[in-house]
Structure formats: C-alpha cells, structure tokens
Amino acid sequence: MTIFNAVDKFTMMSGDRVKIKDLLSSRLTECGWRDEVRLLCRSILQEKGAISSFTVEQLVTEVTPRARSLVPDAVKKELLIKIRTIFDENEDDDIDPEDA
Amino acid sequence: MPTSAAPVPAVAAQSPTTRKAIANNFRELTKDPKKLDEAANQLYESLLEDAVTGIFIEVHHLRKIGNLSALDGVAEESAHRICDVPNLDIFGVSTAKKAIDCTCPNCDRLVAAARFAPHLEKCMGMGRISSRIASRRLATKEGTSASSNSSYVHSGANAGGTDDEDDVDWSSDKRKKKSTQNSRNNGSKKNNGKTF
C-alpha cells in the first residue's frame, strides 16, 4: 500500500489525479459504461429491493466486480498509457526543482 | 482505498519537507518499472472505484427520492398507439364523413344536424327574428286586404325560394324543394317581415 500511497499523494499534489479522473469519467460516459452500470444497479434493486435486509454495501460488493469488467479495453488502455505518460513527465519535471 | 481530497491541502501546506518526501517517494518508485506499472494499475483501479461509487451514490439518491422507477418510464399501452391505417384517423376511427340527419318534429323534414337548430327556430317561429316576424304577421293579417295579400304571395315566391332552400341544401339527402306551396308560404312570411 506504500507504493500506492506515494503515487496517490504525489498525483494529488501535482493535480494530475483530477485530470486523469476527469478523462476517465468522460470516457466512461461516452462509451455508455455509466448507463450500463446504472442499469445493472437498477435490475439488482428490482430483484432484491423488496428484501429489507439488502444493504447498500451488499449492492456495492455485487456490482463493483461486474462494473469493473464492463469497462471497455480501449478505455482502460488509454487510461493506463495516460497515467504512464504523466508519471514520466513528473519524473522529468521534479528532478530539476529538487536539484536546484 | 484512495484517500479523500481533504488531506491534500494539509499535506501540501505542511512544509517543503513533506512535499519533498512525497516527491522523493515517487521518484524512488519511478526507478523501478515494475513498481511503476503496479502504481499505474492501482491508480487506475482507484479512479474506477471512484466512478463506480459515484454511480452508487446517484442510484441510491434516486431510490431514496423515489425517482428510480420514474427512470424506467411507463410502457406504452397498445390502446394509446397511433393508428396508421389508411382511411382511418389516429384513433382508428373512419375518416369518412358520417352525415347525421335529424327529422324536424314540426314539418317532418330531414335536416342536417348542423342546420337543425336554425331550421327549428324558423320552423317553429321561435327566436328573436322569428318572433318578431310572427308578431308582425299577426299585426298585418288584421289590417291587410285580399289584394295586398296576393301581392305579397307573388313577391314571396321569388325571394322565398332562396331562403327556404337553405334547409333543403344542407339536408344530406339533397332533397329538392318539397312543395312550391310550402316555400311560397314561408317566403311570404319572411317578406312580410322585411317590408315592414
């Protein structure tokens, strides 16, 4: 988790996290992933909504893996490449002020 | 789990050392391409998780408000479908004009429904104009001589034809003049009113 923490903090600090997040959400909206997941949630709710013990947490655990697999490969690849380029850029950028 | 946005300003504002530490951590990480890949994947996963959570919140909100079912909409009933058959209107009713005729209870003539009310008014001598005509007719009947009456009948034959024929024209079976006697009488009534 330390790797992730470092990355997370760093991207937040540089403001790249917001950029990537915006890109991802716009891509997901474009390809209809949002609607698909929303539909999935609704169909599950229609099945199990009547059960009073059905909680939001249960819904989340049920939908999240499926939602993850629903993401188109193209979007995932684009995002990963984008993240990598941002990492590379930051690597170059930050060395200079550090040294100076 | 991705940390929330709240601690970011705190981290950034704390001191240059923490900033430096974060940058250092990151730089160390970038040296190892394997770790970098892992980091990229993790970042992607966390962002995706954020997106899913956003949808959950949205759906949850809609559900609590009661708008979730509204999104589904209501299935269109076949009864309300627009009918697309030739010669039928959108409700599936024939477009052919149905002529509705009414039989006048006073003179037993068939009159088109649209003309029935004016006809009845005239035929039964009711209404503003008709009653005026009727009262004048009563007044004239007392005072008129036989010679003047005959002249009215003659002049009425010319003018009366058009007036009474309205009813006949509008009647759907297009009956022609029922009787000359009838039109003459009607015409004379009308004409009486006009001349006075």
Swiss-Prot record, chain A:
Subunit organization: Component of the nuclear pore complex (NPC)-associated AMEX complex (anchoring and mRNA export complex), composed of at least e(y)2 and xmas-2. Component of the SAGA transcription coactivator-HAT complexes, at least composed of Ada2b, e(y)2, Pcaf/Gcn5, Taf10 and Nipped-A/Trrap. Within the SAGA complex, e(y)2, Sgf11, and not/nonstop form an additional subcomplex of SAGA called the DUB module (deubiquitination module). Component of the THO complex, composed of at least e(y)2, HPR1, THO2, THOC5, THOC6 and THOC7. Interacts with e(y)1. Interacts with su(Hw) (via zinc fingers).
Location(s), subcellular: Nucleus, Nucleoplasm; Cytoplasm
Domain of life: Eukaryota
Transcription regulation is among the record's keywords: yes
Name this polypeptide is given: Enhancer of yellow 2 transcription factor
Lineage of producing organism: Eukaryota, Metazoa, Ecdysozoa, Arthropoda, Hexapoda
MF terms (GO), sorted A to Z: C2H2 zinc finger domain binding; chromatin insulator sequence binding; TFIID-class transcription factor complex binding; transcription coactivator activity
GO cellular component terms listed in the entry, alphabetical order: cytoplasm; DUBm complex; nuclear periphery; nuclear pore; nucleoplasm; SAGA complex; transcription export complex 2
From Swiss-Prot, chain B:
First and last residue of the signal peptide: none
Major site of localization recorded for this protein: nucleus
Pfam family, one: Sgf11
Transmembrane segments: none
GO molecular function: transcription coactivator activity; zinc ion binding
SGF11-type zinc-finger residues: 102-123
Low complexity: bias regions: 182-196
Region listing for Disordered, in residue ranges: 140-196
Disulfide bonds: none
Superkingdom: Eukaryota
GO biological process: chromatin organization; mRNA export from nucleus; positive regulation of DNA-templated transcription; protein transport; regulation of transcription by RNA polymerase II
Entry's free-text remark on domains: The long N-terminal helix forms part of the 'assembly lobe' of the SAGA deubiquitination module. The C-terminal SGF11-type zinc-finger domain together with the C-terminal catalytic domain of not/nonstop forms the 'catalytic lobe' of the SAGA deubiquitination module.
Subunit description: Component of some SAGA transcription coactivator-HAT complexes, at least composed of Ada2b, not/nonstop, Pcaf/Gcn5, Sgf11 and Spt3. Within the SAGA complex, Sgf11, e(y)2, and not/nonstop form an additional subcomplex of SAGA called the DUB module (deubiquitination module). Interacts directly with not/nonstop. Interacts with the AMEX complex component xmas-2. Interacts with Cbp80; important for promoter recruitment of Sgf11 that is not associated with the DUB module.
Function according to Swiss-Prot or TrEMBL: Component of the transcription regulatory histone acetylation (HAT) complex SAGA, a multiprotein complex that activates transcription by remodeling chromatin and mediating histone acetylation and deubiquitination. Within the SAGA complex, participates in a subcomplex that specifically deubiquitinates histone H2B. The SAGA complex is recruited to specific gene promoters by activators, where it is required for transcription. Required for nuclear receptor-mediated transactivation. Binds independently on SAGA to promoters in an RNA-dependent manner.
Protein name according to UniProt: SAGA-associated factor 11 homolog
Lineage, broadest ranks: Eukaryota, Metazoa, Ecdysozoa, Arthropoda, Hexapoda
Gene: Sgf11
